[in-house]
Structure formats: C-alpha cells, structure tokens
Amino acid sequence: MTYKLVLLRHGQSAWNKTNQFTGWVDVPLTEQGEAEAKRGGELLKEKNVLPDIVFTSLLRRAINTANIALDAADRLWIPVQRDWRLNERHYGALQGKNKTEIREEYGDEKFMLWRRSYATPPPEIDPNDQYAQNNDPRYAGDPVPEAECLANVVERVKPYFESAIEPELKAGKTVLIAAHGNSLRAIVKMLDNLSEEEIAKVNIPTAIPLLYELDENFKPIKPRGEYLDPEAAAAGAAAVAAQGQK
C-alpha cells in the first residue's frame, strides 16, 4: 500500500514581491501568485495527481492558492480543512521588515540565524505592534506565538499531521496540503527525517506541487519527493535561497 501526499506552497504574495518578512500577517497573492497557483493546479491535472481532500492554513495566500489550484484541476468540490497549525512560521518583530534592510542592519550571520536556524527564533513582536495577531478573531482560544523558530513550527505541525492528515492518507485519499514555506519545510523534515543542517538547505518554491509517495510506514519511497515541474522548481528554490541578498 502506498499513499500520495502533495505539498503546495502558496503563490507569490504581495510581501514576497516586496521582499518583506511575512509570517502570520495576512497578505494577498499578487497577480503573478494567482497565475502560479493556476499553473500548479494545471500540473496536478496534467500529471493525474488529483487530490481528494485539501488541508490549508488560516491565511488567505494559502487558502486562495488552494482554491485557484483546485479550480484549475477541476477539484474545487473536494473537502477543505483549515487550521492555524499549518500557518507560516511567526517571524516575530521581523514581520513587515524588508529582508535586505535587516541583513544590512544586523549582518549576514544574524540574518541567516534568524532566517534559517532551526532552534533560534527572531526577536519577539510587541503585542501592540500593527503586525501582531493577539486580537485577531480567527485565533480566539488558540495560542498566538510572539516569534517562532522552525523547531516551534515542527512542534505544532507534527501532532496536527498525525491526528488530522495521516488518517486521510490511511483511508487511501490523495491529500493536498496548501501552506507555507516553513510549515511545509517542517513536514519535509518529518517525512525525510532530515537533520537540522539538512533542513536549513531546503527551499520550497512557490506553487509547484511536490509529490510524496509514502510506504505503509509513511516513509518516502523517493527521498525528498518529486516536483511535478522539476526545472521550474529548481529555479524557484534558488530564488527563495537568494532572498535578502543585495
């Protein structure tokens, strides 16, 4: 028995375009991002990787990416489950800040520590900051972080994956997760059992489906999965890696 899981990062967002740390700030897709999401859905249809259920975050860039991709794949009718635990990593006080300016102000070492360290979060956000989520009604009753490292994201994604997503896979469904660079990196780390050093080098491109076929123990048959458009994925991952450079 093998299981099919598809990971899809949202298309380009407004703050991807302006090179800002986004985190939990609910920014929209750009026109390019919408086009990327449509192409992602077309790839699902072309490769006959048709999801039966989709999981997404509570942020519109992921929700809209899922909707656009599903529409393009003629799967807009399938069930959707949304949960904050699939949200992007919370970037704390960096949310809204320009990545290049942060790199210039604090230096390469600190910038990369905050951006790619597994266990070191950025500075915490002030609860009164315009980009804080303390009073956002969608998180009523849920813990709102003030900053997260990737380890924190794994801590929230892992139990959700095991309790909500694994049962759908075990039922034989093809599952699509439309989420964010870091919540998807958390899943990649879990599936491939990557070290902290290995996951630091993983960059997820926007809106290119990443297919994992899993064995009965939920281990990847092909390590790191397979992008449905490998050439575009390689170029997209390189662009993500270059964010914040001059």
From Swiss-Prot:
MF GO annotations: phosphoglycerate mutase activity
Residues binding substrate: 9-16, 22-23, 61, 88-91, 99, 115-116, 181-182
Enzyme class: isomerase
GO biological process: one example: gluconeogenesis
Marked site: Transition state stabilizer: 180
Record keywords, A-Z: Gluconeogenesis, Glycolysis, Isomerase
Pathway the protein acts in: Carbohydrate degradation; glycolysis; pyruvate from D-glyceraldehyde 3-phosphate: step 3/5
Assigned EC number: 5.4.2.11
Active site annotation, chain numbering: 10, 88
One Pfam match: His_Phos_1
Reaction equations catalysed: (2R)-2-phosphoglycerate = (2R)-3-phosphoglycerate
Reported function: Catalyzes the interconversion of 2-phosphoglycerate and 3-phosphoglycerate.
Family note: Belongs to the phosphoglycerate mutase family. BPG-dependent PGAM subfamily.
Alphabetical list of NCBIfam families matching this protein: pgm_1, PRK14115.1, PRK14120.1
Protein name: 2,3-bisphosphoglycerate-dependent phosphoglycerate mutase
